[in-house]
Each structure stands twice: as structure tokens, then as C-alpha cells.
């Protein structure tokens, strides 16, 4: 790879890092091409991307920018997962793949400039996704008026029954 190709690759990695809100550095030693292709497809479905790059090029690309905190993590065999949309979906995809594959391990990550450890990424994967959180919030917001109406119905119902009893007594 000549100098101009390296510069183009560095700028491409830098552009991906600048647009990504979530970046994960993984170790991938010994993984088969089939498994790697499967991981890339799953990450694409989740709104992410998985690249295997040379460490020196990755270090240069990550020298500045929001994810520069992970530039020292590029050692040995490593690859980068970029998350563009929802960090939780990317974390879940990577975490699920790590559980099934013995060849990939998570090293570190960066969520909008904050360094994440392997444990942090596992915890992030346990969180509900954005659509699930929206559904939970809407369910909670919907429960308030429903409970309010039920409360008033429970207050008025005995009064209604008493009035019906008085009306039946007067009619008889």
C-alpha cells in the first residue's frame, strides 16, 4: 500500500469515526471469514459497520476527534465497530456475537468521547433499545390518565348506586 492509499484510508477511517456516535475496538484473532461476514451483516442491520484496519493507520485516524480517547487501544489484532444510529443496538449485537464466538473479545469503546471498558459495553447491551424505551414511556404516560379516570369512576360509582337505590325506594 503506497502513501496516497494510506492517506485515503486514514481519511476514510477518520470520516467514519467523526460520524459515529459509538466506537468499539475488538480483538479478532483466529476468526473465520464466514464468522466475520456474519458479524458485519448483523452490525449493518443494527446501523453499524465493522472494519479491520492496520493499527498504525487507526492510531493516526483517531489522533483527534470525539473518539480520540481510544487511540492507544490499537495493538495486536484489532478491528473497529462503528455505530452510527443507536449505541445500544450495536452493543447488543457485539455482545451477542462475543458470547457465541470464542475468537472475538471486546477491548474498549467510546460513546460520544467517553471511554468505555468491556464491562461498560456489556452493561450498555443490557439496556432496552430506544424504541423499547419510547414504548415504556408512552405506556407510563398513558397509565396516568387511565388511572385518573378509574379513580373518578370509583368515587362516583357508589354515589350512583346510592341514588339508584333511593329512586327504587321512592318508586316502590
Swiss-Prot record:
Domain of life: Bacteria
Pfam families on file: Ribosomal_L10 (PF00466)
GO molecular function: large ribosomal subunit rRNA binding; structural constituent of ribosome
A GO cellular component entry from the record: large ribosomal subunit
Listed GO biological process terms: translation
PANTHER family registered for this protein in UniProt: 39S RIBOSOMAL PROTEIN L10, MITOCHONDRIAL (PTHR11560)
Stated role: Forms part of the ribosomal stalk, playing a central role in the interaction of the ribosome with GTP-bound translation factors.
Quaternary structure, from the entry: Part of the ribosomal stalk of the 50S ribosomal subunit. The N-terminus interacts with L11 and the large rRNA to form the base of the stalk. The C-terminus forms an elongated spine to which L12 dimers bind in a sequential fashion forming a multimeric L10(L12)X complex.
Family from the record: Belongs to the universal ribosomal protein uL10 family.
UniProt name for this protein: Large ribosomal subunit protein uL10
Taxonomic source organism: Lawsonia intracellularis (strain PHE/MN1-00)
Protein encoded by which gene: rplJ
Amino acid at each position: 500500500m503506497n502513501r496516497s492509499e494510506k492517506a485515503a484510508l486514514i481519511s476514510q477511517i477518520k470520516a467514519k469515526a467523526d460520524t459515529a456516535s459509538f466506537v468499539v475496538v475488538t480483538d479478532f484473532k483466529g476468526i473465520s471469514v464466514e464468522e466475520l461476514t456474519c458479524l458485519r451483516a448483523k452490525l449493518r442491520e443494527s446501523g453499524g459497520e465493522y472494519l479491520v484496519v492496520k493499527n498504525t493507520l487507526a492510531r493516526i485516524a483517531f489522533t483527534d476527534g470525539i473518539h480520540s480517547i481510544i487511540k492507544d487501544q490499537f495493538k495486536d489484532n484489532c478491528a473497529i465497530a462503528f455505530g452510527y444510529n443507536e449505541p445500544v443496538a450495536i452493543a447488543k449485537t457485539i455482545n451477542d456475537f462475543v458470547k457465541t464466538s470464542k475468537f472475538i473479545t471486546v477491548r474498549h469503546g467510546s460513546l460520544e468521547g467517553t471511554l468505555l471498558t468491556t464491562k461498560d459495553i456489556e452493561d450498555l447491551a443490557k439496556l432496552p433499545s430506544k424504541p423499547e424505551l419510547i414504548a415504556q414511556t408512552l405506556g407510563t404516560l398513558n397509565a396516568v390518565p387511565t388511572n385518573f379516570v378509574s379513580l373518578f369512576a370509583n368515587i362516583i360509582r357508589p354515589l350512583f348506586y346510592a341514588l339508584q337505590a333511593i329512586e327504587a325506594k321512592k318508586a316502590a
